[in-house]
C-alpha cells in the first residue's frame, strides 16, 4: 500500500518556515526585532532537527527503498516530532517508502482515545489503533507504589512486534532521542556494570523485525521546543499512575546539569559512542589481550594513542560537528538539505 503524499503535513511544515521567514501579507504589521529573532531561531530549530534525523537515517541505513515504516505513536512530544519529520523527509527523499502510524491503547483510565485518530485523520496519515488492556495486567502483577515501566514496556514491545507483522511493516520506528541514549549508557555503567547504550538500529527480540530510532541525534530540549512550536496535542504520560523511574530521572538531571555547566561535555560523551577502541578497554571478548605479542612493528593503537588525549588541551567541543552527531559517522544522508 502506498501511503498518500501528505500535502497537509507539508503545508504544516512550510507554515513554520513561512512564519519564520516573514509575513508576506502586506496588510499585516511587520515583525518586531524580537519577533524576527524568535522566528529566525524557530526556523533554525526546525532545519536542525530535520537535518539530524536525515543524517541518522543515512548513517545507519535506517530506511531503504520500498520500506513500510511503522511509526509508534504514543501521543508524547518525541513520537509526534518523529512522525512529523519523517513525513517531511519522505517528500524530499530519493527513495520511496510508506509510513503507517500505530498507537497501542493500553486502556489506562482517562486516556483520551479520540486525540490520536482525530490528529492522524486530519493530517492524512494511515494509522492503526491496537486496543489491548495491558494496564490491568500490570496493575495486577506490580505492587502498589512500584514502577510499572519495565513490565509495561515488555508487554508493549511484544504487541508492537506482532502488529508490525500483521501490517507488513519492514521497520519499526521508536521515538528515543540523544538524551535517552546517554541516559541508558549511564544507567548501564552505574547500575549494571556494562558499557552498553541504546543502538540507533537493531534486530528485535523475536528476530523478525528491525527497530530504528530516527531521533538518535536529536537533543531532548530541541524536541521540547519543537513540540511547543508545532502545538502537538500532547497526551500525558502519567495516566497509568506509575511511580517515575527515579534512576533514569537522576541520569536525566545529571546530563542536563553537565550540558549547562560544561558546554561540549555531553556532546563528547555522545561522540564517544561512535568512537570505540576495544584495545583500550578491558573486555577480552572484544580484543585478544591474552594472545597479544610484540610484533616489532609500530601500532597506531599502542602507547602512541595516548599522546593525543584531549584532556591536555581542555577542548570539550572538538569531537562533534553541529553539537549533535559523532564525526566518525559517514557524512551521507537520504535527503539533500541545500534548500531547507
Swiss-Prot record:
A motif (PP-loop motif) lies at residues 74-79. Coiled coil: none annotated. Its cofactor is Mg(2+); [4Fe-4S] cluster. Gene3D superfamilies: HUPs. InterPro entries: Rossmann-like_a/b/a_fold, TilS/TtcA_N, tRNA_Cyd_32_2_STrfase. GO terms for cellular component: cytoplasm. It is found in: Cytoplasm. [4Fe-4S] cluster binds at residues 149, 152, 240. Keywords: 4Fe-4S, ATP-binding, Cytoplasm, Iron, Iron-sulfur, Magnesium, Metal-binding, Nucleotide-binding, RNA-binding, Transferase, tRNA processing, tRNA-binding. GO terms for biological process: tRNA thio-modification. The keyword RNA-binding applies. Pfam families: ATP_bind_3. It catalyses: cytidine(32) in tRNA + S-sulfanyl-L-cysteinyl-[cysteine desulfurase] + AH2 + ATP = 2-thiocytidine(32) in tRNA + L-cysteinyl-[cysteine desulfurase] + A + AMP + diphosphate + H(+). Pathway: tRNA modification. PANTHER family: AMINOTRAN_5 DOMAIN-CONTAINING PROTEIN, SULFURTRANSFERASE-RELATED. Homodimer. The thiolation reaction likely consists of two steps: a first activation step by ATP to form an adenylated intermediate of the target base of tRNA, and a second nucleophilic substitution step of the sulfur (S) atom supplied by the hydrosulfide attached to the Fe-S cluster. Catalyzes the ATP-dependent 2-thiolation of cytidine in position 32 of tRNA, to form 2-thiocytidine (s(2)C32). The sulfur atoms are provided by the cysteine/cysteine desulfurase (IscS) system. Belongs to the TtcA family. This is tRNA-cytidine(32) 2-sulfurtransferase. It comes from Burkholderia ambifaria (strain MC40-6).
